[in-house]
Design a protein with these regions (language model features):
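C-terminal helix-to-coil terminal segments
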Residues: 1-4, 18, 35, 157-214
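Phosphate-binding beta-alpha-beta segment of Rossmann-like dinucleotide-binding domains, i.e.
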Residues: 1-43, 55
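Residues at the starts of beta-strands that form the adenosine-phosphate
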Residues: 43, 57, 62-66
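Glycine-rich Rossmann-fold phosphate-binding loop(s) that bind the pyrophosphate
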Residues: 49-50
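N-terminal Rossmann-fold NAD(P) dinucleotide-binding loop
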Residues: 53-54, 110
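Gly/Ala-rich phosphate-binding loop of Rossmann-like dinucleotide-binding domains
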Residues: 57, 61, 141, 165
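Rossmann-like adenosine-cofactor binding region
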Residues: 73-163
Length: 214
């Protein structure tokens, strides 16, 4: 999943989809493309430094990005830790959300966090749609309060807010960050392990909640 987030980050900053559409619409030499920005020395704030967050950070560091992170606890890693999410949001060019869904993170990216972001910043979400206040995000994108967003997850999937589809500064993906053969194989193994543990009166590898909070 972390490589998918890296792909979204590069696509946003270097406007790869815009470049693709520029060619398809036969605009080459007829108009100029807006200059985009290099990733070197840009600041990335990761919300949730778990397995996915750590994997993303390692890959992002290889691109010479400066890494910051927010979470409930400081970890023994060589990245700057923020206990205050709002303070981190004010500093970064990219806010990348990799935390778990659930009650503890529901709406964690609220209007105050979004309003704290720089005008040239981006939001990338491969976590759960429930972690973001979608109305606040939509308003920020519509009014160019932030530069853009890349979203792989949404509230009320697959019936996402149709207003997102009309925006030019957002990349949309159908909850497919885990869509590799390798990842799905590991997910299947984990599911089997959970079922095995359940029927053997052993604690599941991960807690399963119902209904799913996406």
């Amino acid at each position: 999943m972390s490589d998918f987030a890296i792909g979204l980050l590069i696509s946003l900053s270097r406007r790869i989809i815009d470049n693709h559409n520029y060619i398809k619409k036969n605009k080459w030499l007829r108009s100029t493309l807006e200059l985009n920005q290099s990733l070197t020395n840009k600041k990335v704030g990761i919300v949730g430094m778990g397995k996915i967050g750590k994997s993303f950070a390692k890959k992002a560091r290889a691109l010479y990005l400066d890494i910051f992170y927010y979470g409930p606890n400081k970890k023994k890693i060589n990245y700057k830790y923020y206990k205050d999410l709002k303070k981190m949001a004010k500093e970064v060019n990219f806010l990348v959300i990799t935390c778990k869904g659930g009650d503890k993170t529901n709406g964690i990216i609220d209007q105050s966090i979004i309003n704290s972001l720089r005008k040239d910043s981006y939001i990338i979400n491969i976590s759960r749609g429930s972690v973001i206040n979608e109305n606040a995000l939509l308003k920020a994108l519509q009014n160019n309060k932030i530069k853009g967003a890349a979203l792989d997850v949404f509230n009320n999937e697959p019936n996402i807010n149709p207003k997102f589809k009309k925006l030019k500064n957002v990349i949309l993906s159908p909850h497919h960050a885990s869509g590799t053969k390798e990842t799905r194989y590991e997910m299947a193994k984990l599911s089997c392990k959970n079922v095995f543990n359940f029927f053997n009166n052993t604690k599941p590898v991960h807690k399963i909640s119902w209904p799913w909070n996406y």
